[in-house]
């Protein structure tokens, strides 16, 4: 019986490159990493976040003055995992250009907006969704109250940061993230989540 990750890794294409020492094979993501392209695909969770952070730090060490391109196709996920990626994007020296392919929802949308101003893009048929952080807790009433306070604090912090990245007033962000708020690529530009819709490579 194969698990999902075995099947997924079996489907990752390999590319062959000619070198002075002969042929060398790379999986497609490693080959694209050489071009300073990182893929953020699927649920944002701790393991994936650690891999993205490691790639960002590696590319900074390789060429601190060259842009990094982060392609996002994600339904969102863990706030703490997402913030690890976000903080690293802001911390490193290279500009991080973000590109939405498919969808950038929830934490995916937050990371999309967190790219370098002027270098945040959507492809024409992608969609973006913003909303408030989700929480589902069980346990004693006092513990649930603690978690509720924590999630309200996180919500306010994320709204402040989205306000900064989009240029929208805080009260507009608070209203628009109260429920799932879907946007087309063009609407995401109008809102300030991205800077342009990219139809062709420049």
Curated annotation (Swiss-Prot):
Keyword Kinase attached: no
GO BP annotations, alphabetical order: protein quality control for misfolded or incompletely synthesized proteins
MF-aspect GO terms: ATP-dependent peptidase activity; ATPase binding; serine-type endopeptidase activity
GO CC terms: cytoplasm; endopeptidase Clp complex
EC assignment: 3.4.21.92
Annotated keywords: Cytoplasm, Hydrolase, Protease, Serine protease
Gene3D superfamilies: 2-enoyl-CoA Hydratase, Chain A, domain 1
Catalytic activity: Hydrolysis of proteins to small peptides in the presence of ATP and magnesium. alpha-casein is the usual test substrate. In the absence of ATP, only oligopeptides shorter than five residues are hydrolyzed (such as succinyl-Leu-Tyr-|-NHMec, and Leu-Tyr-Leu-|-Tyr-Trp, in which cleavage of the -Tyr-|-Leu- and -Tyr-|-Trp bonds also occurs)
Compartments it resides in: Cytoplasm
Chief localisation class: cytoplasm
Cross-referenced PROSITE patterns: CLP_PROTEASE_HIS, CLP_PROTEASE_SER
SUPFAM superfamilies in the cross-refs: ClpP/crotonase
Residues at the catalytic site: 106, 131
Family affiliation: Belongs to the peptidase S14 family.
Quaternary structure and interacting proteins, as annotated: Fourteen ClpP subunits assemble into 2 heptameric rings which stack back to back to give a disk-like structure with a central cavity, resembling the structure of eukaryotic proteasomes.
Function: Cleaves peptides in various proteins in a process that requires ATP hydrolysis. Has a chymotrypsin-like activity. Plays a major role in the degradation of misfolded proteins.
HAMAP family: ClpP (MF_00444)
Descriptive protein name: ATP-dependent Clp protease proteolytic subunit
